Amino acid sequence: MPKMKTKSSAKKRFKITATGKIKVAAAGKRHGMIKRSNKFIRDARGTMILAEPDAKKVIHCYLPNGL
């Protein structure tokens, strides 16, 4: 049976840290910033670490062989 391929879209969206956690960009910043609070814009500026249940799903479904 052949190896599962890593999804190309996942390669572009996720980074795996040295400890095995998954780093992603914060969601909700594509458009509509006028109606967002300044706190939301500040908090969504950088990257965030996915929660453990979500990270397991991402690794199992989209990144079977890592990046």
UniProtKB/Swiss-Prot annotation:
Keywords, ordered alphabetically: Ribonucleoprotein, Ribosomal protein
SUPFAM superfamilies the record matches: L35p-like
GO biological process, one term: translation
PROSITE patterns attached to this UniProt entry: RIBOSOMAL_L35
A cellular-component GO term for this protein: cytosolic large ribosomal subunit
GO-annotated molecular function: structural constituent of ribosome
Residues annotated as signal peptide: none
Source species, domain of life: Bacteria
InterPro entries: Ribosomal_bL35, Ribosomal_bL35-like, Ribosomal_bL35_CS, Ribosomal_bL35_sf
Pfam families: Ribosomal_L35p
Gene3D superfamilies on file: 4.10.410.60
HAMAP family per UniProt: Ribosomal_bL35 (MF_00514)
Stated family: Belongs to the bacterial ribosomal protein bL35 family.
Name of this protein: Large ribosomal subunit protein bL35
Species this protein is from: Bartonella bacilliformis (strain ATCC 35685 / KC583 / Herrer 020/F12,63)
